[in-house]
């Protein structure tokens, strides 16, 4: 208790250093804790799974096209997993653009079709009702979706009309797990509701202990035919992928972005690096300022050692003082986190709730940080000669060197973060301002067709009715004066597409992405034809012609379309006499997705019309409101509901760069925090250093030194430290930038102005911190100082 009081008394005597030290550490801890909470949330995705490392999905690879699927839907030359090794097995089907009808309202829904075994593998909290799918009509709603439909009414037992025309009954309301989840849905439907859904299912397995997963993967690596090779020679392989790994492989789920989240290891490494650098900045600042405060007690420690104080007592004093400071800083940091919770959640696009991890993290900081920060001061004073401690209070040259070393290390980190911040903001600007190579203005992606996802619900009559509704949509769109062009499809120009191998006239194999289109597609997006001509194809003429982009023409080994042709490898294997189909036109390259992914060699099978629920619509500039009103009325006329989903292409493109924007913003914010923390450290050190030099300054003034001379003298040491830190930070920043962006097809240049701006920014802010103290020192009264020193 006596030691605690002694420690508290010392901290109160050194109020300036205590406050500066506390604020610097609090800012550092607040930033680091925010980042660590986000990183922890990313690393614990899908922990609601009973065992995410040992629950596996089937990942199929069909000639270069990977995706999650199942084995039971392959009916030819396939293999099944031996049920003797299976502890539990379930399937799910994601239906991203589905809907239900409540009264007269059509409400978009992300539906997950599965069975009750799914809940044996994934634990969801039950808010109301029961967590089961006992009947084909059973349905479970998320708490948020139930509130959207029913408000404050009790939803249990309510009946909704599903898109296939069948009634479903709400039997339970599920809450959100504490962890982040890969699969996100609004409604869970029973797989018994239909036997023929719109898309294939994905199988999930939990195996019995001792099952050889490698042996199963080895068996799956053998190519097998999908269908009868007389007609279709495509093959597929399969492997098992754990639930834990699915999140980190976005290519498996990128066609349903509204239902599946994916992670980015590179992004997480960046955040981890920023977190580590900020924490290190705070710790260095803390140790440095604490050492400055201890320098005033060198004589005191020397006398204590003369009178027999042992090393344990000395360490206890230092450790308790650091613990009090760390505890205070930790409390302030959590206060900052709470105050900044709204902007933090906006920045990271997630809701942070308090979990056990927060408690463990705080306890770890409180236990470890005081020990870490006490080691160097303890070694310094425990092994310093008592005589040396008594004779000198902070005048040793090595003490000054260590202070400058710690300060320089802080500024190396600060310069590094500032340079990275400037670069990634420039990279973001380039991504947002670089034209993708196609028209982006005044184009909408609209879901106009709302039909059943249950294929078993269709009869001949219902199919005819569906065709009539789609024809009505097309006729009305053709008659609208505000609509220039439209293209029905299953995906828009940004949607990831599949591909396959094609052969050129030399029999060489080339993998090309496939994008089905009509002649209107190229006009709608203003994609320039650079060679040949895309013919007008009417509905009666069902032929398909091939168009390629420049990248595909080059990949195929052609320089012109003269004599150029392709054939799908699958077709050639099925019939060796199949001839090449000519390439009729070449179009300009464009970026189909994120600019950093580059331009993909693409082939366009061009036909009269391709069906799909998604309409890409180019409208007259300035007529956005009129077009939306027209489409709303059209939906009501065709489907009896004004509800429909739409986005604007410009917004979709901006959304692609959400993570890039987040990275740039994080660097900017935390680089600013690093400057503040380092400036606080500089302020604390200068308070001590400049005060120690008052006698020297007084003598220089007596000998005729001007204020300009004193400014130069006092600034010089700190300027030198900043310049050295900057010189060291330049190659580090350059290396990190080049390492991270080496695979980017489009990246901003690393120009010298980024480094110059960072140098000026840090120097101006940091030395501005010193201005008042140096001005005060330059105008001291020499007589008064000589009397008091």
Predicted regions: what they are:
Residues 2-4, 9, 13-14, 223-275, ...:
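Membrane-helix entry/capping segments
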Residues 4-20, 24, 284-325, 383-393, ...:
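Intracellular coupling helices
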Residues 13-40, 262-299, 327, 402-427, ...:
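Hydrophobic alpha-helical transmembrane segments of multi-pass inner-membrane transport and secretion
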Residues 27-56, 340-347, 413-442, 740-745:
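Alpha-helical transmembrane segments
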Residues 30, 34, 288, 322-386, ...:
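Small-residue-rich transmembrane alpha-helices
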Residues 35-98, 199-206, 217-221, 239-249, ...:
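Membrane-proximal extracellular/periplasmic loop immediately following the first transmembrane helix
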Residues 115-127, 139-263, 475-655:
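Mid-to-C-terminal secondary-structure elements
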Residues 260-341, 345-346, 360:
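Hydrophobic alpha-helical bundles that form the membrane domains of multi-pass transporters
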């Amino acid at each position: 208790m006596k030691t605690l009081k002694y420690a508290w008394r010392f901290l109160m005597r050194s109020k300036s250093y205590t406050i500066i030290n506390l604020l610097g550490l609090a800012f550092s801890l607040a930033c680091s804790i925010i980042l660590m909470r986000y990183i922890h949330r990313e690393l614990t995705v899908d922990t609601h799974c009973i065992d995410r490392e040992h629950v596996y999905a089937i990942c199929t690879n069909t000639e270069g096209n990977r995706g999650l699927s199942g084995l039971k839907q392959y009916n030819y030359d396939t293999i099944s997993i031996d049920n003797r090794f299976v502890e539990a097995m379930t399937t799910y089907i994601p239906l991203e653009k589905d809907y239900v009808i409540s009264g007269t309202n059509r409400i978009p829904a992300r539906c997950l079709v599965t069975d009750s075994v799914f809940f044996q593998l994934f634990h969801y909290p039950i808010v109301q009702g029961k967590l089961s799918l006992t009947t084909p009509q059973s349905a479970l709603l998320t708490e948020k979706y139930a509130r959207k439909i029913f408000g404050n009414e009790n939803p249990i037992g309510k009946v909704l009309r599903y898109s296939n025309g069948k009634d479903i009954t709400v039997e339970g309301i599920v809450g959100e797990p504490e962890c982040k989840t890969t699969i996100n849905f609004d409604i869970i439907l029973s797989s018994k509701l239909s036997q023929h859904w719109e898309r294939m299912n994905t199988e999930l397995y939990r195996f019995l202990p001792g099952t050889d997963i490698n042996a199963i993967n080895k068996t799956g690596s053998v190519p097998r035919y999908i269908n009868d090779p007389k007609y279709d020679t495509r093959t597929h392989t399969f492997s098992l992928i754990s639930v834990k790994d699915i999140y980190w492989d976005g290519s498996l789920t990128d066609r349903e972005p509204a239902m599946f989240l994916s992670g980015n290891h590179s992004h997480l490494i960046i955040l981890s690096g920023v977190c580590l650098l900020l924490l290190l900045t705070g710790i260095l600042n803390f140790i440095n300022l604490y050492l400055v405060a201890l320098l005033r007690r060198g004589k005191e420690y020397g006398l204590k050692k003369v009178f027999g104080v042992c090393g344990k007592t000395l360490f206890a004093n230092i450790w308790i003082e650091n613990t009090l400071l760390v505890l205070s800083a930790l409390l302030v940091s959590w206060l900052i986190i709470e105050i900044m919770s709204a902007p933090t959640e906006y920045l990271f696009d997630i809701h942070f709730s308090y979990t056990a991890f927060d408690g463990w993290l705080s306890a770890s900081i409180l236990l470890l940080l005081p020990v870490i920060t006490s080691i160097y001061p303890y070694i310094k004073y425990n092994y310093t000669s008592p005589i040396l401690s008594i004779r000198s209070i902070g005048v040793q040259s090595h003490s000054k060197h260590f202070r400058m070393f710690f300060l320089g290390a802080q500024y190396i980190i600060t310069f590094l973060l500032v340079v990275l911040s400037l670069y990634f903001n420039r990279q973001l600007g380039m991504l947002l301002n670089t034209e993708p190579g196609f028209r982006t203005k005044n184009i909408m992606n609209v879901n106009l067709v709302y039909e059943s996802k249950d294929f078993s619900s269709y009869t001949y009559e219902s199919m005819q009715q569906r065709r009539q509704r789609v024809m009505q949509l097309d006729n009305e769109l053709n008659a609208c004066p505000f609509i220039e062009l439209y293209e029905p499809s299953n995906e828009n120009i940004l949607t990831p597409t599949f591909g396959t191998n094609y052969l050129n006239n030399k029999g060489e194999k080339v993998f090309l992405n496939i994008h089905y289109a009509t002649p209107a597609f190229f006009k709608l997006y203003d994609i320039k034809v650079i060679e040949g001509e895309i013919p007008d194809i009417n509905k009666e003429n069902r032929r398909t012609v091939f168009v390629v982009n420049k990248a595909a023409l080059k990949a195929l080994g052609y320089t012109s379309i003269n004599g150029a042709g392709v054939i799908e490898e699958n077709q050639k294997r099925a019939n060796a006499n199949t001839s090449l189909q000519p390439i009729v036109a070449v179009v300009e390259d464009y970026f189909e997705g994120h600019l950093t992914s580059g331009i993909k060699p693409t082939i366009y099978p061009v036909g009269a019309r391709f069906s799909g629920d998604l309409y890409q619509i180019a409208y007259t500039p300035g007529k956005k409101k009129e077009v939306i009103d027209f489409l709303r009325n059209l939906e009501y006329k065709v489907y009896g509901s004004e509800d429909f989903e739409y986005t604007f292409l410009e917004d979709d493109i901006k959304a692609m760069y959400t993570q890039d924007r987040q990275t740039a913003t994080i660097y900017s914010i935390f680089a600013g925090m690093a400057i503040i923390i380092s400036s606080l450290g500089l302020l604390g050190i200068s308070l001590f250093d400049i005060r120690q030099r008052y006698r020297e300054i007084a003598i220089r003034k007596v000998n005729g030194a001007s204020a300009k001379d004193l400014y130069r003298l006092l600034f010089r040491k700190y300027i030198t430290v900043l310049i050295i830190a900057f010189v060291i930070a330049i190659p580090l920043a350059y290396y990190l930038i080049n390492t991270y962006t080496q695979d980017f097809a489009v990246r901003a240049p690393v120009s010298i102005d980024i480094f110059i701006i960072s140098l000026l920014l840090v120097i101006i802010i940091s030395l501005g911190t010193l201005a008042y103290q140096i001005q005060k020192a330059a105008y001291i009264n020499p007589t008064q100082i000589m009397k008091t020193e």
